[in-house]
Amino acid sequence: MAFSSGMSADFAELDYRQTPLGDLVLRRRRLRNLDGIEVFEVKLGEDFLMSSLFHEVEVALADLGIARLEGGDFDVVVGGLGLGYTARAALKNSSVRSLVVIDFLQPVIDWHQQGLVPLGKEITADARCRLVHGDFFALAADPGRGFDPFTPSRRFHAVLLDIDHSPKNLLHERHADFYAEAGLRRLASQIYPGGVFALWSDDAPDPEFLAVLGKVFTGCEAQVVRFHNPLLEKDSASTVYLARR
C-alpha cells in the first residue's frame, strides 16, 4: 500500500470519509516497541472503533455463538463488518452455509472490496459471504423486510452483533430501542427456533440487560473473554452475551 504524502513510514492515513455518524478514518501504524507489528485502526469522530491489535473477542463472538447451534448448514448474520474478524471466524466454520454481513458505513465495505484492510480479499472471495450496506438496527426492527435485501422476511440460525460499545454505551441514541424487550422480540422473530443471538460488549456483564434478554430468549449468559493487551502489558476483558431463541 502507498503511504499518504508527508507521513512517516510508521504512520499512514489510508482513507478519510465524512459520514452521517462523523468523520471516518482508516489508518495504519507500525509499532516499533512491539517488534514493528503493523496495526490497522478505525476511528469514527472521537471514538476508536476497532484495532487489528485486539480482535480476540470479535473472533470469540462468532466461535461462541456458532458453537451453540445444533446441526449444520447455518445461515448467519453479522451486524458490523469492522475489520472483518467476526466475519472471517464465521466463515472458517464449515457448517456455515451463508453469511450476510451488514454495515451502516459504505466506506467500511469499500475497504474490504478494495483490499485496503488485511482480511478484505479473503472475506470477499468467499462465495458464501455477502456484504450489505444497511442499517442493522432498522432492519432488526422490521421483520417484514429482514436482513437479506433479496429475500424479505428471511430467518437465520444465528445473529452476531458487534456495533455499539455496549447495550448502554451506544454509537447513536436511536439504537437504544433495540436493546429493550420489544426490540429484542422483533429481532427474535428473524431467528429460527433453537437459533442464537450473540452480542459483543466492551463493558462488564450487565445484570439489567441480561434480565431483559431473558424475557425474550432462553439460556442467556454473559461470558467474559480475556485477552492480553501488549500496549498496557496486562490483560483486558470484554463480554459476549449469548442467548437461544
Language-model features: locations:
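Short strand-turn motif at the edge of the Rossmann-like AdoMet-binding core
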Residues: 163-164, 200-204
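N-terminal auxiliary segments of SAM/dcSAM-dependent transferases
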Residues: 1-37
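Short, basic/glycine-rich phosphate-binding loops at helix/coil junctions
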Residues: 37-45, 162-167
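Class I S-adenosyl-L-methionine
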Residues: 18, 203-245
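Short glycine-dipeptide loop
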Residues: 191-197
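The AdoMet/dcAdoMet-binding core of the Class I SAM-like
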Residues: 55-190, 220-221, 225-226, 234-236, ...
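Glycine-/small-residue-rich active-site loops that bind phosphorylated ligands and cofactors
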Residues: 49, 198, 205
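Class I SAM-dependent methyltransferase Rossmann-like catalytic core
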Residues: 22, 28-29, 42-73
